[in-house]
Amino acid sequence: NTEINSRLGIVLGVTVEQVEKAIQEHPRAVAVLVNNPTYYGICSDIRSIVKLAHEHKMMVLVDEAHGTHLYFQPDLPVSAMDAGADMAAISMHKSGGSLTQSSILLTNKGVNADYVRQIINLTQTTSGSYLLLSSLDISRRNLALRGRESFEKVMEMAEYARKEINEIGGYYAYGRELINGTSVFDYDVTKLSVHTLGLGLAGIEVYDLLRDEYDIQIEFGDVSNILAYISIGDRIQDIERLVGALADISRIYKKDKTGMLSGEFVNPLVVKSP
């Protein structure tokens, strides 16, 4: 079980010690599955996890749905492939600019890509959408040519937004200060995650207000936070509009935060694992 930051109400990364314990408790396991990063931008020590798994002759599979951009900016957390993972699924449509549903499965040295392709053909359609495939190729080319500068711009806009939002009061737009070397080994600063309980408002309330009153659609809201996904297509004007709307919400809708739910989680009972 991963740790929880009860103040923010977010799940943190898996630690090397937790992976080692899981390996010892499940000697018949053949692979380790990790996220890089989480929805909120939390990154585990993936290099050490890969090293540990490989020492036990296990493969490392990475859910990198929210990490396409990690391959194009050296100032961001390490990508799965650079960390030595065996396979990684990246959702190009999330931060890479391709059409929704389009993703790429990456394989590293030591993985038989032809065999992987054969298994994929047995488990999903062999008549893929050429709209999705062509969008992947176009976005791949765009990132190959302009990825570094595009995500540098995204990082700058996210850091600017973080600073401006924290000056409003009541919000907490968190970033690299969460890094503790274990459960938060690194942080993806392109994620604009904002804690809202200081306003006396749940994240989902702020999410609804942004959409219904300000015509701003962000990624999601939960009990404690909102997440704005800054893309390579966003402009500084879009960031200013978001910051202005959040300032407005603070001024108009702020409530007494007494009695607000905490961010504690209850682990469900696992009857049978997948």
Predicted regions and their residues:
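Non-catalytic terminal extensions of PLP-dependent enzymes
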Residues: 163-166, 177-183, 188-274
